[in-house]
Amino acid sequence: MNKEFLLEAQKWAKEELDICINFWLKNGLDKENGGVYTCLDREGKIYSTDKSVWMQGRCGWIFAYLCHVYGVKEEWLAASKSCLDFMEKYCINRECGDRMYFTVTADGKPLRQRRYCYSEAFYCIANAEYYGITGEKEHLDFGIRDHNVEILCPFLNTACVDVRSRE
């Protein structure tokens, strides 16, 4: 491969990344409740206001990671914080060993809880990345707490899982 091809490929990748990130910033952010809407069509129209909890964590992580890689942009940092705050406030089932829900309503009411740990994993890495950017110790603490929950996942009482969530 020649240098010109690699430079063009790099330019194309950056353009695609910008399109994707701007799509989510423009259409996905929930300015009323926090977090992001996760059910959008290709035009950015919301077709369900239910929110995937693991996607809240994934967006919280990716926006903080973008700050780590490309430099801090306030809108990226704010988007990450919005997702993390939404998760901390609404997405942790305090009555089930701090396990996270899988799906919640737009305003954070629980809809479904699963037995696997995707929500916890993304919340953990999102807090770690956010802490790395901001130095805000509470996010380090949240990440450690969540990591400990995630490590114990196979041993947690699964009786807390709503049977209807397996439908």
Walk through the language-model features, giving the residues of each.
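Glycan-recognition and catalytic cores of secretory/periplasmic carbohydrate-active enzymes
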Residues: 1-167
